[in-house]
Amino acid sequence: MMKKFNVTGMSCAACSSRVEKAVSKVEGVQSCSVSLLTNSMGVEGSASEESIIAAVEKAGYGASVAGAEKKQSAETDQLKDKDTPVLMHRLIASVGFLAVLMYISMGHMMWGWPLPAFFADNHIAMGLAQLLLCVIIMVINQKFFINGFKGLIHRSPNMDTLVALGSGASFVYSVYALFAMTDAQVKGNAELVMSYMHEFYFESAAMILTLITVGKMLEAHSKGKTTNALKALLNLAPKKATLLIDGKETEVTVDKVKKGDVFVVRPGESIPVDAEITDGSTAVDESALTGESIPVDKVVGDTVSAGTINKAGFIKCSATAVGEDTALSQIIKMVSDAAATKAPVAKIADKVSGVFVPAVIVIALITIAVWLLCGQTVGYALARGISVLVISCPCALGLATPVAIMVGNGMGARKGILFKTAASLEEAGKTQIAVLDKTGTITKGEPKVTDIIPFEITENELLKYAYSIEVKSEHPLAKAIIVKAEGLSLNPYEVTDFKAESGNGLSAEYNGKRIIGGSKKYISSLIGISNDILSKADKLSEEGKTPLFFMKGDKLLGIIAVADVIKEESPQAIKQLQNMGIKVVMLTGDNERTAKAVGKLAGVDEVIAGVMPDGKEKVVAELKKQGKVLMVGDGINDAPALTRADIGMAIGSGTDIAIDAADVVLMKSKLTDVPVAVRLSRKTLRNIHENLFWAFIYNVIGIPLAAGVWIPLLGWQLNPMFGAAAMSLSSFCVVTNALRLNFFDITNPKKDRKIKYKSKKDDNAMTKTMKIDGMMCSHCEGRVKQSLEGLAQVSQAEVSHEKGTAVVTLTAEVSNDVLKKTVEDQGYNVISIS
């Protein structure tokens, strides 16, 4: 189980890297992930909270257990942007004193502005005034020095260390110049006095601190925006509920509501907790939770979720889940936990950040030494070294990945797509093969009546006869007929002597005649059926439908076709995946004929039929040999396959087990959200790469420029103040680039492009076709398929009992005798192998 902590005192990627290393060394810690963006840490393992906090404090930072109060308000407070107001006050004060300092130090020289009379020819007074103003600005921004030197003492230098050293060095050298100038004036050396006057860097020391504060404030403000989606979710949680106690309405805080309590909700109010409607009807706006903009009609017996809005009627509800067990709380937990994890691509930046600051300090010292050896003055060499310190920015590197992940995660949450980890958000876009479970994923998972073909009676009469016998059955196909008849307000006939013919059909007595319903094979054995009618039934079967025959006495009443119909959006979703260069595979336990009919309508690339529930995981494992696999499912039997896949996606309406096993949850239960999730992942990953590129290139170009590498060749020279300005904007630019993701329409497929990839599948894979006698049904297909795929050399077996064949794909040579024996051991006869 992951323990979450709040971490204080971190200012850049070097800090988060230091904390991560310190905690990882604690005995019992299995993994540790620190987020600079949310100032949080996730730790897995058996280590105690006390030992983890002690390790963080030893590293020079503060830590506390997150969510100790376990209240929404505590989480909201944690995400509140507390830094921007503080930095704004610091900035206003710094700019005020800096303006005076710049006026005194440079105004009269650059623009000829007049100085106060008491400064006239009083160089020591001017120096002391600059010293005093600089000290005030340093006190205002003392946090840089406290954190910076604390990091240096703990041997974990960070960005604040670079700022403190840069500004501090400018200040110390300026103080030295002031004392030297005072000595020269006492000795009456006017020329030396003027020389030391130009060695003052008080304005540089102050400007560095002010400009870095500007950058920090912009960065904090932008970082605050990246958590807007999570804050919006937290704000959805209602604060109060109206309970019904002894028939009276009593307003209480939501944390007082218990499971089983009855409460009322009026139009326009938010649902306080997850509940079931016990009285009334309404339409509920679930857009904040699922991204679905159209209100959903709700009646007695339907469930409603916390945070959704009652748009229409007055309803009474019974609480079914409260506190952290509500759907809203679970969504918040998923998004929050994902923010605390790290994407694999972040490891590059982490490794660089760990050595970045010490390396920059060394480069700055080398720069100073080289310029001194080249004969330059101490002031000139120091200016080059300070420029190196203040232009270098580990923050941009550290923020490149987490800000993009946070924004991407928030965008997904707004659309009802929940990524459980940062890794799942990164990996989804690399999908090469999408495996879709048929029932409940491509199809609705509920059989429906698709065709009614009566003979010499009306459709309603046929449906009424069928309804009369099916109403007493629990079979899923019977339920489809019942729903259809009840939808037309039909009443069943009063039948007697109901019988269930095992494996064949149903029958009952009505007006002295037997009404019988069943399969084509069963009814054909009772009465003669014309070839024309049989061909109609065969056509229905080819379309993936199940034709049910009904007769009365010795007369055929008609055919009712039932099918698990394809969701309206399924073909569109599959087409979008294919346009992204993703191969779409449909996985089902149905017989090959029905499966291929559904697959054709849906437009999938490949159909794998006859797969037993326990065989789905094996199919996914085999497909992984060809490329990265994304599995989409909703049932208990999908859980192993979801876990086995590189990325598992669960339909939100599916079972808890499937949702727990998945990496991504689709709250709207729409297949079109699969390409949306892939599209979001690809765009987020691209944004991360852009951020990392600019963060790296900024430092690669900036550090040599600051060190003065180009001065001998091109005369390019960087003033420390411009270096500080560049540093202050670098992190802001990275965060702003991540925020651009918010303007990307992840539902628009127009800019999708195919990503070509090399298949892992062996190009020399062989296939063999086996002619098999004795297979009678889909169960036979499953037995043969399972036995053949049990061979190590067989990657796939496509079996058809109707064709009497098995097409076997081999990854290595296997003798025909072995294949033959494998099938015949199951009780079937192998005629030939080619």
Language model feature labels by segment:
Residues 1-125, 150, 232, 248-251, ...:
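Flexible metal-binding regulatory segments at protein termini and peripheral loops
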Residues 17, 30, 341, 431, ...:
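Conserved ATP-binding TGD loop and adjacent catalytic N/P-domain core of P-type ATPases
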Residues 26-50, 199-200, 231-325, 422-466, ...:
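Conserved cytosolic catalytic loops of P-type ATPases
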Residues 86-240, 351, 715-720, 726, ...:
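Transmembrane helix-loop-helix hairpins at the membrane interface
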Residues 110-124, 153, 172, 411, ...:
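Membrane-embedded alpha-helical bundles of multi-pass transporters
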Residues 181-184, 190-191, 206-267, 298, ...:
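Juxtamembrane coupling segments of multi-pass membrane pumps/enzymes
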Residues 289, 348, 383, 396-469, ...:
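Conserved catalytic phosphorylation-site environment of P-type ATPases
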Residues 449, 453-580, 592, 604-620:
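P-type ATPase nucleotide-binding
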